[in-house]
Amino acid sequence: MKKCVYTDELLQAKVRIVSTRWQVEACTAQARNPAGITAGQNVLSLESFAAQIHPAETVDRATALWFLRDLLRTIPVGRYQRIAKEVGFPAVLFGWISTLIGEKIEPDALAGPQKDLRALYAAYLSRLKERGLRSREMAIAAAAEKAAKETVGTINVSGFIDFRAVEMDFLDALAEKNEITVVLQKYGANAFVKAREAAF
């Protein structure tokens, strides 16, 4: 890693990465941030930035929900069978599966009550692979493999306290060739220590 600085100020950077799209919109909407640096085209969500490093066809939410509804028709889900036909169940599954992928948890690692969903999770991953699609988290993981070789310049990262394992791996790989400033935005001393231990 070249350099990692922790600060509560937004410094001038070639790219500013934030954790979500709504944060990008919020940054772009305000003409200037408190530090007086213009927020503009260089503000990207981590997902968008990863797509620039390694373009990948990601599955949209509607398609993912359709896949899950279809799989629920044929794959038994044990103790969850009673609620499997509920309208909101595929959306809950989508969020849960996204979290599992983001934390790099494989279907075989599921235990306890979650093991009833092991076959469904594995089938969902297979369906994505068959269609040549990736989840947002898979796309970020693929970008991480390439990121260690990419030189971008100075990068500000904020909102990363919410990042999951796959996103942290991406930032870690990116730090191999780039200077990264982690912007904590006055989270306090405890967050600073936690962030430093978790990230780098």
Predicted regions and their residues:
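Basic/charged alpha-beta structural segments of nucleotide/phosphate-handling enzymes
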Residues: 4-5, 10, 21-151, 165, ...
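Conserved P-loop NTPase "ATPase switch" module shared by AAA+ and STAND
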Residues: 151-163
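Acidic, metal-coordinating catalytic cores used for nucleic-acid/nucleotide bond scission
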Residues: 15-24, 161
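N-terminal start-of-chain detector that recognizes signal peptides
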Residues: 15-16, 126-128, 153-156
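A general structural motif
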Residues: 1, 11-13, 150-154, 177-179
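Structural recognition of the conserved hydrophobic beta-strand(s) that form the central parallel beta-sheet
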Residues: 16-18, 156, 179-185
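Conserved RecA-like helicase ATPase core segment
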Residues: 166-200
